[in-house]
Protein backbone atom coordinates (compact mmCIF):
# COMPACT_ATOMS: atom_id res chain seq x y z
CA UNK A 1 0.00 0.00 0.00
CA UNK A 2 1.40 3.34 -0.98
CA UNK A 3 0.44 6.70 0.47
CA UNK A 4 0.27 9.28 -2.28
CA UNK A 5 0.51 13.00 -1.74
CA UNK A 6 -2.63 14.88 -2.53
CA UNK A 7 -2.55 17.31 -5.44
CA UNK A 8 -0.98 20.64 -4.56
CA UNK A 9 0.81 19.52 -1.38
CA UNK A 10 4.38 20.13 -2.64
CA UNK A 11 3.46 23.55 -4.02
CA UNK A 12 1.65 24.50 -0.81
CA UNK A 13 4.59 23.50 1.40
CA UNK A 14 7.02 25.26 -0.91
CA UNK A 15 4.93 28.44 -0.63
CA UNK A 16 4.84 28.16 3.16
CA UNK A 17 8.62 27.76 3.31
CA UNK A 18 9.15 30.70 0.91
CA UNK A 19 6.91 32.74 3.21
CA UNK A 20 9.25 32.07 6.13
CA UNK A 21 7.09 29.42 7.79
CA UNK A 22 8.99 26.50 9.25
CA UNK A 23 7.48 23.15 8.43
CA UNK A 24 7.93 20.25 10.83
CA UNK A 25 7.01 16.68 9.95
CA UNK A 26 6.36 14.35 12.89
CA UNK A 27 5.75 10.84 11.61
CA UNK A 28 5.72 7.23 12.66
CA UNK A 29 7.30 6.29 9.33
CA UNK A 30 10.82 4.91 9.04
CA UNK A 31 13.63 7.45 8.66
CA UNK A 32 14.27 6.69 4.97
CA UNK A 33 10.56 6.91 4.18
CA UNK A 34 10.27 10.20 6.07
CA UNK A 35 13.22 11.66 4.15
CA UNK A 36 11.80 10.52 0.81
CA UNK A 37 8.43 12.06 1.70
CA UNK A 38 10.29 15.21 2.76
CA UNK A 39 11.78 15.54 -0.71
CA UNK A 40 8.51 14.64 -2.44
CA UNK A 41 6.53 17.32 -0.60
CA UNK A 42 9.35 19.89 -0.69
CA UNK A 43 9.96 19.98 3.05
CA UNK A 44 13.51 19.15 1.95
CA UNK A 45 15.02 20.65 -1.17
CA UNK A 46 18.12 19.25 -2.90
CA UNK A 47 20.25 22.26 -1.95
CA UNK A 48 19.55 21.99 1.79
CA UNK A 49 22.05 20.78 4.36
CA UNK A 50 20.54 17.65 5.95
CA UNK A 51 21.64 17.07 9.54
CA UNK A 52 20.67 13.55 10.50
CA UNK A 53 20.53 12.49 14.15
CA UNK A 54 19.33 8.95 13.73
CA UNK A 55 20.47 5.53 14.80
CA UNK A 56 21.43 4.67 11.21
CA UNK A 57 23.07 7.96 10.19
CA UNK A 58 26.42 7.75 8.43
CA UNK A 59 29.33 9.10 10.43
CA UNK A 60 27.64 8.74 13.82
CA UNK A 61 29.25 6.28 16.19
CA UNK A 62 26.53 5.35 18.64
CA UNK A 63 26.94 4.20 22.18
CA UNK A 64 23.51 3.00 23.25
CA UNK A 65 21.88 1.49 26.30
CA UNK A 66 20.05 -1.85 26.38
CA UNK A 67 16.97 -0.26 24.76
CA UNK A 68 18.93 1.25 21.86
CA UNK A 69 18.78 4.78 23.31
CA UNK A 70 21.96 6.87 22.83
CA UNK A 71 23.86 7.40 26.08
CA UNK A 72 24.24 10.89 27.52
CA UNK A 73 27.88 11.16 26.46
CA UNK A 74 27.02 10.06 22.93
CA UNK A 75 24.05 12.44 22.79
CA UNK A 76 26.15 15.39 23.97
CA UNK A 77 28.78 14.72 21.28
CA UNK A 78 26.24 14.24 18.50
CA UNK A 79 24.27 17.35 19.46
CA UNK A 80 27.46 19.44 19.64
CA UNK A 81 28.48 18.22 16.18
CA UNK A 82 24.99 18.87 14.79
CA UNK A 83 24.89 22.39 16.22
CA UNK A 84 28.34 23.15 14.76
CA UNK A 85 27.29 21.78 11.34
CA UNK A 86 24.09 23.82 11.44
CA UNK A 87 25.89 27.03 12.38
CA UNK A 88 28.44 26.51 9.59
CA UNK A 89 25.73 25.78 7.02
CA UNK A 90 23.75 28.88 7.98
CA UNK A 91 26.94 30.96 7.88
CA UNK A 92 27.61 29.56 4.38
CA UNK A 93 24.12 30.64 3.29
CA UNK A 94 22.55 27.18 3.20
CA UNK A 95 19.13 26.22 4.47
CA UNK A 96 19.17 23.43 7.05
CA UNK A 97 16.85 20.52 7.78
CA UNK A 98 17.25 18.29 10.83
CA UNK A 99 16.12 14.67 10.78
CA UNK A 100 15.80 12.86 14.11
CA UNK A 101 14.46 9.47 15.08
CA UNK A 102 12.63 8.18 18.12
CA UNK A 103 15.86 6.99 19.77
CA UNK A 104 17.46 10.43 19.72
CA UNK A 105 14.23 12.10 20.80
CA UNK A 106 13.95 9.68 23.72
CA UNK A 107 17.56 10.38 24.69
CA UNK A 108 16.99 14.14 24.43
CA UNK A 109 14.01 13.83 26.75
CA UNK A 110 15.81 11.50 29.19
CA UNK A 111 18.81 13.78 29.56
CA UNK A 112 16.98 17.13 29.53
CA UNK A 113 18.44 18.35 26.24
CA UNK A 114 15.27 19.95 24.89
CA UNK A 115 16.90 23.39 24.77
CA UNK A 116 19.70 22.04 22.56
CA UNK A 117 17.09 20.48 20.29
CA UNK A 118 15.33 23.84 20.03
CA UNK A 119 18.62 25.60 19.33
CA UNK A 120 19.18 23.21 16.41
CA UNK A 121 15.56 23.55 15.27
CA UNK A 122 15.84 27.35 15.26
CA UNK A 123 18.63 27.07 12.66
CA UNK A 124 16.44 24.86 10.48
CA UNK A 125 13.97 25.77 7.77
CA UNK A 126 12.44 22.30 8.16
CA UNK A 127 12.47 19.60 10.80
CA UNK A 128 11.60 15.91 10.49
CA UNK A 129 11.08 13.49 13.37
CA UNK A 130 10.71 9.87 12.27
CA UNK A 131 9.48 6.72 14.04
CA UNK A 132 7.89 8.88 16.71
CA UNK A 133 5.03 7.75 18.90
CA UNK A 134 1.83 9.73 19.44
CA UNK A 135 3.15 10.75 22.88
CA UNK A 136 6.41 12.00 21.37
CA UNK A 137 4.49 14.04 18.80
CA UNK A 138 2.63 15.74 21.65
CA UNK A 139 5.84 16.29 23.62
CA UNK A 140 7.52 17.95 20.64
CA UNK A 141 4.57 20.31 20.11
CA UNK A 142 4.53 21.14 23.83
CA UNK A 143 8.31 21.75 23.88
CA UNK A 144 8.06 24.19 20.97
CA UNK A 145 4.99 25.99 22.31
CA UNK A 146 6.34 26.32 25.86
CA UNK A 147 9.72 27.64 24.73
CA UNK A 148 8.79 30.01 21.92
CA UNK A 149 8.09 33.73 22.12
CA UNK A 150 4.45 34.76 22.26
CA UNK A 151 4.76 35.95 18.66
CA UNK A 152 5.30 32.37 17.43
CA UNK A 153 2.19 30.56 16.24
CA UNK A 154 2.14 26.77 16.01
CA UNK A 155 -0.36 24.60 14.21
CA UNK A 156 -0.50 20.81 14.44
CA UNK A 157 -2.21 18.99 11.59
CA UNK A 158 -2.74 15.25 11.40
CA UNK A 159 -4.82 12.69 9.60
CA UNK A 160 -5.12 9.83 12.05
CA UNK A 161 -5.78 8.69 15.60
CA UNK A 162 -2.03 8.72 16.25
CA UNK A 163 -2.08 12.52 15.77
CA UNK A 164 -4.77 13.35 18.35
CA UNK A 165 -2.30 13.90 21.23
CA UNK A 166 -0.28 16.34 19.13
CA UNK A 167 -3.34 18.24 17.90
CA UNK A 168 -4.77 18.60 21.42
CA UNK A 169 -1.59 20.27 22.66
Feature names for model-found ranges:
Residues 1-151, 155-157, 164:
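Cytosolic catalytic headpieces and adjacent flexible linkers of membrane translocases
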Amino acid sequence: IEDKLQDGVPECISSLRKGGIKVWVLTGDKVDTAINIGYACQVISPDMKVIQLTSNAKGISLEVDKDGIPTQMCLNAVLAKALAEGEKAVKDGLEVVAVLDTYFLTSIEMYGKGQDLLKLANMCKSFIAARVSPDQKGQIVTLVRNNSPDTVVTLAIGDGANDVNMIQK
